[in-house]
């Protein structure tokens, strides 16, 4: 279309293509480029004419297969973000699929550092090991 595009890569987003149209407005063209279902952990973008058709192709690099998280459409990695303990700090809690069960990414110790109430509600590792959704943290009083 003759307009320069800005291509963005990042965590938790699709590879995103933005363009400034002739009116000077920023337009999201991600869907037009067929990239609207590419949410991931993107950390690199390069442009190269791979198939020698005269058009630049978008190459994206993301977290590899050796990473702990194995996200698919059926078993996504999920991040819950809120100020769960109302201390004016954002508390991200990530769950991922581990052999068919959703589990918190952070260890009990790491979650206790972030949300100390967890230590009081999950005194034993065995009870914390049963946590497989954000709702399982409801006994802590800050999850709906």
Task: Walk through the language-model features, giving the residues of each.
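Acidic, glycine/proline-rich Ca2+-coordinating loop motifs
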Residues: 1-144
């Amino acid at each position: 279309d003759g307009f320069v595009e800005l291509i963005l890569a990042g965590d938790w987003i699709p590879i995103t293509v933005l363009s400034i149209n002739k009116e000077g407005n920023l337009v999201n063209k991600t869907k037009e480029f067929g990239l609207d279902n590419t949410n991931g952990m993107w950390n690199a973008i390069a442009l190269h004419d791979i198939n020698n058709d005269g058009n630049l192709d978008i190459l994206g690099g993301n977290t590899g297969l050796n990473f702990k998280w194995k996200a698919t459409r059926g078993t996504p990695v999920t991040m819950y973000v809120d100020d769960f303990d109302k201390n004016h700090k954002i508390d991200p809690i990530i769950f991922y699929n581990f052999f068919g069960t959703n589990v918190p990414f952070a260890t009990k110790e790491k979650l206790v550092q972030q949300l100390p109430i967890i230590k009081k509600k999950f005194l034993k590792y065995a009870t914390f090991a049963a946590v497989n959704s954000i709702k399982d943290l409801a006994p802590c009083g800050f999850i709906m």
